[in-house]
Amino acid sequence: MGANPESGALSVAGQLLGLAQRMLDLSVDYAAQRKQFGKPIGSFQAVKHHLADVATALEFAKPVLYRAAYALAHNEPNAAVWVSQARLASCEASWLAARHGIQVHGAMGYTWEVDLQMFMKRAWALDSAWGDRALHKARVAEYVLSGAAPLGCGHTFED
């Protein structure tokens, strides 16, 4: 992989997924420690759903990132589209992790005592690095609407 926009965008996608995972880990730990009404807040359904949403977004974004890395490493003709998909999925996962992390932490999430604010700001800063969402969405839309995109799970590793 050389120094090109796709490599940069793929790198950012990986960083965003790592940030999302770290924000989820911090939120899970905090939900287990913080008590309200004599119980950990992680025992409440609303908190569980927030954390489950983030975990699901992360698990859905990982294979997209891996597929993009494979496409880029093997110089596939549509590697840029795969990278854009990974970039979008990773960005959504990191933003969801930040939003729900703040919900779980409450005001503590913004303080210097909790590292969540640092990871959240990093995710926000990386949001527009190596192409903003509009650029990546346009790239994916152009590919899908061109009719050249073989859609479906049977076409994942085909050219």
Go through each PLM region and give its residues.
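Alpha-helical interface subdomain recognition
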Residues: A3-D159
